[in-house]
């Protein structure tokens, strides 16, 4: 299999320093998280400062309270993302090793779990401060895509979450024995850069659409519309990219080489696709509901 692109010589660490005999490093993935949070915070502040964007020209909350909301959201992302990975992808392993559930630094986060964590955190926050739930959801979801874009780029830099073997001109030869373990391939194994596919779809394309709807089409005046577009857009993007992503190792067996979580004969769906289908359905319901209500 011949690929045009070799994986660039990139380090997962932006820089590292040694203090008092201990090594500290800033990783690209951590920087992506930080930058995504800062961008989301600024977008939320800008939106709440523009009263004309909202129903009855009234933002759901004051710009000064965004930082307080952000604390709840970060907790929802971390707790939900970790528990989602544990429950959706490796429940048997963590049932046998429960102390490792809290070891977030070892890796293992799931977007769908993080999303559920954010939903719960935002719902509790709205109850506590008497904030319109759908407008709060719109405020949050229109800010998420830049973080998704940066996170997927960091996945690429880390040479992780790569795609299935491919001989397309833009396929990439990722380093490491796991990436090179391609049954039936002689020589170097090239793979779909599925991280970049996700960055383009759920980050750049979806993010541009959401910002255009908010700032050019007045979508925030229809509570739930932006939330619906985000849910359906992310779900559809993830569903499509799952056809190119390397299947989750815990689902791969000799009789199930594609790592399908649900299978009927030769066909089925991955866990990512199964979790994305409810997102698409719920997103479409939100969109239809919002469009039925006069702005």
UniProtKB/Swiss-Prot annotation:
It is found in: Cell inner membrane. The keyword Transmembrane helix applies. GO terms for biological process: lipoprotein biosynthetic process. It comes from the Bacteria. InterPro entries: Lgt (IPR001640). Its EC number is 2.5.1.145. Keywords: Cell inner membrane, Cell membrane, Membrane, Transferase, Transmembrane, Transmembrane helix. The keyword Membrane applies. GO terms for molecular function: phosphatidylglycerol-prolipoprotein diacylglyceryl transferase activity. Belongs to the Lgt family. This is Phosphatidylglycerol--prolipoprotein diacylglyceryl transferase. The lineage of its organism: Bacteria, Pseudomonadati, Pseudomonadota, Alphaproteobacteria, Rhodobacterales.
């Amino acid at each position: 299999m011949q690929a045009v692109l070799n994986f660039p010589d990139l380090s997962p660490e932006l820089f590292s320093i040694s203090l008092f005999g201990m090594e500290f490093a800033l990783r690209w993935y951590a920087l992506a998280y930080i930058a995504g949070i800062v961008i989301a915070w600024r977008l939320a502040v800008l939106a709440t400062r523009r009263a004309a964007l909202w129903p009855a020209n009234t933002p759901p909350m004051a710009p000064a309270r965004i930082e307080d909301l952000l604390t709840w959201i970060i907790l929802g992302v971390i707790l939900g993302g970790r528990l989602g990975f544990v429950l959706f992808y490796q429940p048997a392993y963590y049932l046998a090793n429960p102390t490792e559930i809290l070891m977030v630094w070892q890796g293992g986060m799931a977007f769908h779990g993080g999303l559920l964590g954010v939903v719960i955190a935002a719902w509790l926050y709205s109850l506590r401060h008497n904030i319109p739930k759908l407008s709060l959801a719109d405020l949050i979801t229109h800010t998420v895509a830049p973080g998704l874009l940066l996170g997927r780029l960091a996945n690429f830099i880390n040479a992780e979450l790569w795609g299935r073997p491919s001989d397309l001109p833009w396929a990439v030869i990722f380093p490491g024995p796991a990436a090179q373990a391609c049954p039936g391939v002689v020589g170097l194994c090239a793979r779909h850069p599925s991280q970049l596919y996700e960055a383009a779809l759920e980050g750049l394309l979806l993010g541009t659409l959401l910002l255009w709807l908010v700032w050019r089409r007045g979508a925030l005046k229809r509570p739930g519309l932006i939330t619906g577009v985000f849910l359906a857009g992310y779900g559809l993007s993830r569903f499509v990219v799952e056809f190119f992503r390397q299947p989750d190792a815990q689902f791969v067996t000799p009789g199930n080489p594609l790592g399908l979580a649900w299978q009927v004969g030769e066909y089925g769906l991955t866990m990512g696709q199964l979790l994305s289908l409810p997102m698409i359905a719920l997103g479409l319901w939100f969109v239809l509901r919002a469009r039925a209500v006069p702005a």
